[in-house]
Amino acid sequence: MRKFVANLLAVLFATCVVAAPRPKNVILVIGDGMGPSHVTAARWIRGDKLQFLRMPVTGLVATFSADDAVTDSAASASAYATGMKTNNRALSVDANGNPRKTVLEVANESGKATGVITTTDFWDATPAAFLSHSKDRYDDARSIVQQIVSGKADVVLGGGSDLLGKGSFPSLAELKKSDRVVVTSRAELEATKARRVLGVFNTQPNDTEDPDAPLWVLTKWAIGKLSADPDGFFLLIENEGIDTASHNHHSDDVAKALTEYDEALRVVLDFAAARRDTLVIAVGDHETGGLDICCEGGEDKGWRMEWSTPDHTGAAIPLFAFGPGSQSFAGYIDNTDVGKKLLSFVRK
């Protein structure tokens, strides 16, 4: 009898696992450099409007790379993109330099629409890890740009217009010779009906959002376009300003970038809550600045940001999840686990 009950429970458990809903759409929202104290700061800044409060599943993510206890953005984004560790500076290749398929590439193979949005140069480490392959992000910039422009992502939106045509970077005129429609303003973006779009906007100080093309606006536009695909979509959204401002210890711009991130996340969660077929993951890629939140003291009980380093740290980072499949991200996991789960959800 005991054996029968055990077997029955095993069958029931297996049935539940198989029957667990799979997301049609997957949206990964990365706050570059966003560690535990950044999340604490965001709670003070946003109060009850903080979008993480809408996400019932939480986790903690280990971030070390293949060759260092402290990752850089290239290696950490590659772990999310491929489910494998790589060396710092490398983009979606293994530790031996062999290219590995990214979640965006697998989503394309599965017939899904795909897109990437960032507040920094569109070929920077995090977007590039999902869109290209390179042994060294710093020695291969022109190739990375060419891979992104000729790649299969339907939508690529980011900064970098000020660098085009300088050094090894192609000019805007060269980019316009590709099969993509290239836009450089919000008005041009909202007017285009093209299937393949490259938006190149102005990169701002500390990589905060372009006021002409705020991150939440780009997010709303991209979701509207990609969600028309009957097979679903994969979308990466990154706010780079959290990282850059943390490197520079510019607390005001950190607060600004956290607000921008939260406003974009609001757009994502509003979409996901209405649809109930969309997995949303909100997470950093590593911690930057050794941030701590300290009390000002006095009657106002204020707070301030204090910094211990201009560099990245090895701190584990918070993860928040919403939607079908979100429970699989609970607990203490590795950044490669995030990538493996994302890959499993976009495969046919």
Regions found by a protein language model. Name each.
Residues 36, 259-298:
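Metal-dependent active-site segment of extracytoplasmic phospho-/sulfohydrolases and closely related
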Residues 125-131, 203-206, 222-223, 227-267:
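Active-site His/acidic residue clusters
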Residues 10-19:
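Hydrophobic h-region of N-terminal signal peptides that target proteins for export
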Residues 183, 212-227:
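A Trp-anchored, charged/polar loop motif used as the substrate-binding/catalytic surface
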